[in-house]
């Protein structure tokens, strides 16, 4: 196993632990908490794939980070922050809409890269809107957090979500996945539209 893969996982585990401590003090906003939940699933998937214990990896990650901080000057930190482009977090859905459980009468599931597409084929003759929470950088979709399909009544009838065990996807993956879910829902004579925010970037 590549040593960089292991050390990267260890550092990610420790940084997630710090962010969790921050959230436990009720200091995180909605985008922060969304990323925290998503990254927890990703770390579990990576840990399982690598065969590494998360608690042990967190301790090792702490040692790596402490060593880096000992060598870090304030001036170097300012330069690093200034050189990193900032991403924007855009939200169509509330936390309640993102976390709500939903069920399918006739489930269908497909994959587009590392994205999982799920939809209920029992839904017919409905007006449906696709809403998503995602981040944008350089005016391009960077990371899809979650996309869901809602009827006018507010029922969830479809979803696109990243697989925790396969981190990383492109904006093309997202566009392909959206095409799949639209095609699948329109097959049953549903009318599907995409939110204005999502239209601009996907």
From Swiss-Prot:
<dbReference type="Pfam" id="PF00600">
    <property type="entry name" value="Flu_NS1"/>
</dbReference>
<comment type="function">
    <text>Inhibits post-transcriptional processing of cellular pre-mRNA, by binding and inhibiting two cellular proteins that are required for the 3'-end processing of cellular pre-mRNAs: the 30 kDa cleavage and polyadenylation specificity factor/CPSF4 and the poly(A)-binding protein 2/PABPN1. In turn, unprocessed 3' end pre-mRNAs accumulate in the host nucleus and are no longer exported to the cytoplasm. Cellular protein synthesis is thereby shut off very early after virus infection.</text>
</comment>
<dbReference type="GO" id="GO:0003723">
    <property type="term" value="F:RNA binding"/>
</dbReference>
<keyword id="KW-1190">Host gene expression shutoff by virus</keyword>
<feature type="short sequence motif" description="Nuclear localization signal">
    <location>
        <begin position="34"/>
        <end position="38"/>
    </location>
</feature>
<protein>
    <recommendedName>
        <fullName>Non-structural protein 1</fullName>
    </recommendedName>
</protein>
<keyword id="KW-1192">Host mRNA suppression by virus</keyword>
<keyword id="KW-0899">Viral immunoevasion</keyword>
<dbReference type="GO" id="GO:0039524">
    <property type="term" value="P:symbiont-mediated suppression of host mRNA processing"/>
</dbReference>
<dbReference type="InterPro" id="IPR009068">
    <property type="entry name" value="uS15_NS1_RNA-bd_sf"/>
</dbReference>
<keyword id="KW-1088">Inhibition of host RIG-I by virus</keyword>
<comment type="similarity">
    <text>Belongs to the influenza A viruses NS1 family.</text>
</comment>
<keyword id="KW-1103">Inhibition of host pre-mRNA processing by virus</keyword>
<keyword id="KW-1035">Host cytoplasm</keyword>
<dbReference type="GO" id="GO:0030291">
    <property type="term" value="F:protein serine/threonine kinase inhibitor activity"/>
</dbReference>
<dbReference type="GO" id="GO:0042025">
    <property type="term" value="C:host cell nucleus"/>
</dbReference>
<keyword id="KW-1262">Eukaryotic host gene expression shutoff by virus</keyword>
<dbReference type="InterPro" id="IPR038064">
    <property type="entry name" value="NS1A_effect_dom-like_sf"/>
</dbReference>
<dbReference type="GO" id="GO:0039540">
    <property type="term" value="P:symbiont-mediated suppression of host cytoplasmic pattern recognition receptor signaling pathway via inhibition of RIG-I activity"/>
</dbReference>
<keyword id="KW-1113">Inhibition of host RLR pathway by virus</keyword>
<keyword id="KW-1048">Host nucleus</keyword>
<keyword id="KW-0694">RNA-binding</keyword>
<dbReference type="InterPro" id="IPR004208">
    <property type="entry name" value="NS1"/>
</dbReference>
<keyword id="KW-1090">Inhibition of host innate immune response by virus</keyword>
<comment type="subunit">
    <text>Homodimer. Interacts with host TRIM25 (via coiled coil); this interaction specifically inhibits TRIM25 multimerization and TRIM25-mediated RIGI CARD ubiquitination. Interacts with human EIF2AK2/PKR, CPSF4, IVNS1ABP and PABPN1.</text>
</comment>
<dbReference type="GO" id="GO:0030430">
    <property type="term" value="C:host cell cytoplasm"/>
</dbReference>
<keyword id="KW-1114">Inhibition of host interferon signaling pathway by virus</keyword>
<dbReference type="GO" id="GO:0039657">
    <property type="term" value="P:symbiont-mediated suppression of host gene expression"/>
</dbReference>
<keyword id="KW-0922">Interferon antiviral system evasion</keyword>
<dbReference type="GO" id="GO:0039580">
    <property type="term" value="P:symbiont-mediated suppression of host PKR/eIFalpha signaling"/>
</dbReference>
<feature type="short sequence motif" description="Nuclear export signal">
    <location>
        <begin position="137"/>
        <end position="146"/>
    </location>
</feature>
<keyword id="KW-1102">Inhibition of host PKR by virus</keyword>
<dbReference type="InterPro" id="IPR000256">
    <property type="entry name" value="NS1A"/>
</dbReference>
<keyword id="KW-0832">Ubl conjugation</keyword>
<dbReference type="GO" id="GO:0039502">
    <property type="term" value="P:symbiont-mediated suppression of host type I interferon-mediated signaling pathway"/>
</dbReference>
<keyword id="KW-0945">Host-virus interaction</keyword>
<feature type="region of interest" description="RNA-binding and homodimerization">
    <location>
        <begin position="1"/>
        <end position="73"/>
    </location>
</feature>
């Amino acid at each position: 196993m590549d040593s960089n893969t292991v050390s990267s996982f260890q550092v990610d585990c420790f940084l997630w632990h710090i962010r969790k401590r921050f959230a436990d003090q009720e200091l995180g906003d909605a985008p922060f908490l969304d990323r925290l939940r998503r990254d927890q699933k990703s770390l579990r998937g990576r840990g399982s794939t690598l065969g590494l214990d998360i608690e042990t990896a967190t301790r090792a990650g702490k040692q790596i980070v402490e060593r880096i901080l000992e060598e870090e000057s304030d001036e170097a930190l300012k330069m690093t922050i200034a050189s990193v482009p900032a991403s924007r977090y855009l939200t169509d859905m509330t936390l309640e809409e993102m976390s709500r459980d939903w069920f399918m009468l006739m489930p269908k599931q497909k994959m587009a890269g590392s994205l999982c597409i799920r939809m209920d084929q029992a839904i017919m003759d409905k007006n449906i809107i696709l809403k998503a929470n995602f981040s944008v950088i350089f005016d391009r979709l960077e990371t899809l957090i979650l996309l869901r399909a809602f009827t006018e009544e507010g029922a969830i009838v479809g979803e696109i979500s990243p697989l925790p065990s396969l981190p990383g996807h492109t904006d093309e993956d997202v566009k392909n996945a959206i095409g799949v879910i639209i095609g699948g829902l329109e097959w049953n004579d549903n009318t599907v539209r995409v939110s204005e925010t999502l239209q601009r970037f996907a």
